[in-house]
Amino acid sequence: MINKIRFVVFSFALTAFSGLSAQNDTTFIANGNPIIQYKYTADPGAMVHDGKVYIYAGHDECPPPKEHYLLNEWCVFSSPDMKTWTEHPVPLKAKDFSWAKGEAWASQVIERDGKFYWYVTVEHNTIPGKSIGVAVSDSPTGPFADARGSALVTNDMTTEYTKIRWDDIDPTVFIDDDGQAYLYWGNTQCYYARLKKNMIELDGPIIPV
């Protein structure tokens, strides 16, 4: 009986220790492709900063056996050598945008003047269709917070060019040599617009490509 009790206690302690280790151990060695094999990720966007590469991706939590997707949050992974990676847990969730109802779709992060701006695709809460929001952080790994309190681009801003509700997706950002920043996005119809230096406002009309 004593041996059985010892075995149960040992097993419980080992299980608890293993769970704690797995929870705290966020660094792993990539073993071929896909790089991230312990969870489902989608729509990766990469950024290089201070000798490290960062990958920002949506986290697909759809439970089996459903054959769809469930994206409520984004992940960020960093690597100094493209082999050893570290996950920095939950830098941003779709619900961090009070005006959004969910769906953490494709996104892109860029650095400017020591701040990191994350342009994301979400479903708007009151304006039907996909919208683009922007979050900001002092660190490439977050945490990030809504930089505006409202969407940067909404579906009703582009109905002149297409009637679909999901054309305002997949944002990316480019800063030209003269310092002018541009936002690019689209689906079936592509768009671009200049950004103000604060990186959270459009600086001119939306131009179809």
Regions from the PLM with identified roles:
Residues M1-T26:
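Bacterial Sec-dependent N-terminal signal peptides
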